Amino acid sequence: MRVLAIDPGLTRCGIGVIESSNMSMVGVGVLKSSVEDSIELRLMDIDSQIREWITLHNPDVIAIERVFSQQNLRTVMGTAQVAGVALLAAAQSNIKVVMHTPSEVKAA
């Protein structure tokens, strides 16, 4: 099973692909959007980059880190918006999604 994992973030969004059959890392990267751009352009840019990874790696499932409460409301809003973009890209690609909290990811 091939898993595409996303750690959502508006300025920097972590992304990686693992092959669970042999526990190997297929790819890892950081998706970036420019702070100079408007929010809608930034989200569109992140969406495009996520879709490129989906097309390139053909994952069976997408794992997205669940947004948790942060001190900075602006940061949590951007993170939640990127998570929404990732959920939409997965749904439109007919790929199952699993959501995990940061503590669940660290425990695994």
Regions found by a protein language model. Give the residues of each.
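Phosphate- and other anionic-substrate recognition elements at nucleic-acid/protein interfaces
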Residues: 1-108
